[in-house]
């Protein structure tokens, strides 16, 4: 899909915010490509991010906006996880069908399956989603999925 000028302006605003955090050199580190896209409301898989120019480590490559834009457009067309996909994945760990899994199982799912997050990334996600365990150490995974899919700025 072709982006309108308003959409491109919105992309540029978010890109410039990442550039501001990244040293104000007119470019964003390619390692942050997926993060920029997620802030813009798409949820690309890491393999797809790498395929359009994302990198595995900070400092390998910088992306000016002119290179970011076609990468973003390419990622718009990629398969993305849906709410139903994530709910179905968590249901497999919900033995009693009550909508809860243990905090330990949540960590296991996030470190061992799919995109395999680091412990630091999981700590950050749990902190950002303000995830609360009940007295038995369980979390309501529907709330978790909704908060993660809403992104870091859900009111935007």
Swiss-Prot record:
SMART domains: EFh. GO terms for cellular component: muscle myosin complex. Residues 6-43, 81-116 form the EF-hand domain. GO terms for molecular function: calcium ion binding. Keywords: Motor protein, Muscle protein, Myosin, Repeat. The keyword Repeat applies. Gene3D superfamilies: EF-hand. The keyword Cell inner membrane does not apply. It comes from the Eukaryota. In molluscan muscle, calcium regulation is associated with myosin rather than with actin. Muscle myosin contains two types of light chains: the catalytic light chain, essential for ATPase activity, and the regulatory light chain, a calcium-binding protein responsible for Ca(2+) dependent binding and Ca(2+) dependent Mg-ATPase activity. This is Myosin, essential light chain, adductor muscle. It comes from Mizuhopecten yessoensis (Japanese scallop).
């Amino acid at each position: 899909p072709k982006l309108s000028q308003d959409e491109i302006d919105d992309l540029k605003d978010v890109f410039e915010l990442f550039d501001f955090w990244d040293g104000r050199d007119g470019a964003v580190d390619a390692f942050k490509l997926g993060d920029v896209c997620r802030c813009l409301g798409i949820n690309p898989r890491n393999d797809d991010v790498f395929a359009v120019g994302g990198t595995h480590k900070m400092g390998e490559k910088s992306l000016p906006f002119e290179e970011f834009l076609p990468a973003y457009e390419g990622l718009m067309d990629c398969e993305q996880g849906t709410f139903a996909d994530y709910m179905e994945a968590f249901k497999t760990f919900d033995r009693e069908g009550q909508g809860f899994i243990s905090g330990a199982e949540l960590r296991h799912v996030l470190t061992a399956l799919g995109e395999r997050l680091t412990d630091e990334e999981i700590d950050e996600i749990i902190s950002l989603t303000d995830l609360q365990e009940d007295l038995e150490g369980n979390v309501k995974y529907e709330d978790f999925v909704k908060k993660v899919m809403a992104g870091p700025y859900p009111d935007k």
